[in-house]
């Protein structure tokens, strides 16, 4: 049976935390920042954990992730 391939789009966008959660960047920070308050923009910094249901799908895209 051939090796499974990792989806390149998934490995660029998601990281697996030490506890196995899928971490992703906050959405909504590409454009349109002028109409948002500074506090709204600050809240979009960093990463957030994905829901368990969606994380399960993303983990299937990365079969060789160490903590998957």
UniProtKB/Swiss-Prot annotation:
One GO cellular component, as annotated: cytosolic large ribosomal subunit
User: Which branch of life, at top level?
Assistant: Bacteria
Q: Which GO terms describe its molecular function?
A: structural constituent of ribosome
Q: Which UniProt keywords apply?
A: Ribonucleoprotein, Ribosomal protein
Keyword Ribosomal protein included in the entry's annotation: yes
Query: Which Gene Ontology biological process is one annotated for this entry?
Result: translation
Recorded hits in Gene3D superfamilies, A to Z, give: 4.10.410.60
**InterPro entries, per database record:** Ribosomal_bL35, Ribosomal_bL35-like, Ribosomal_bL35_CS, Ribosomal_bL35_sf
Q: Which family does it belong to?
A: Belongs to the bacterial ribosomal protein bL35 family.
Indicate what this protein is called per its UniProt record.
Large ribosomal subunit protein bL35
* Species of origin: Pelagibacter ubique (strain HTCC1062)
């Amino acid at each position: 049976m051939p090796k499974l391939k990792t989806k390149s789009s998934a490995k660029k966008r998601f990281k697996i935390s030490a506890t196995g959660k899928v971490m992703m960047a906050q959405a909504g920070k590409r454009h349109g920042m002028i109409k948002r308050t500074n506090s709204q923009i600050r809240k979009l910094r960093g990463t957030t954990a994905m829901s368990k249901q969606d994380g399960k799908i993303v983990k299937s895209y990365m079969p060789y992730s160490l903590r998957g």
